[in-house]
Amino acid sequence: MVSVSTENVELVKRIYDAWGREASARDYLADDIEYVNPSYAVEPGVRYGRDSFRVVRDTYGDFKVRPVEFLDAGPEDVVVLAHYTASGSGSGVPVTGEHGYIWSVRGGKAVRFRWFQSHRETLEAAGLDRDDSA
């Protein structure tokens, strides 16, 4: 029998797989998913709904995320440590870096998405302790 947390990790992997193919991941997201921007974001706070993800795509038309690790962080949470590349849609200035994400999954759908600017910050927010985090 596959554990719920393993199923959650697989669901989050399917989201990134869909995005990697430039396909929709809507089927994996709850209609009212919470998209949580950190306090230091240009627009901090919580957005609701699947369309929240479109804002990033519209701001950074070529925003690409390359997950490097998926971690089971409890009964509902999945941590994704990733690297990203993008360029501003208006300026064309290239941007690269690392991000971390915490996805909360319930009932076979992602219900909450939080992002962080570093792997270390993500691991701390998830309550995971790793000495090798960057």
Feature map (PLM): residue ranges:
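A beta-strand edge to alpha-helix "cap/lid" segment located at domain peripheries
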Residues: 1-13, 55-134
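A solvent-exposed, acidic/Ser-Thr-rich amphipathic alpha-helical stretch
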Residues: 22, 26-76
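Short acidic-aromatic low-complexity motifs
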Residues: 2-31
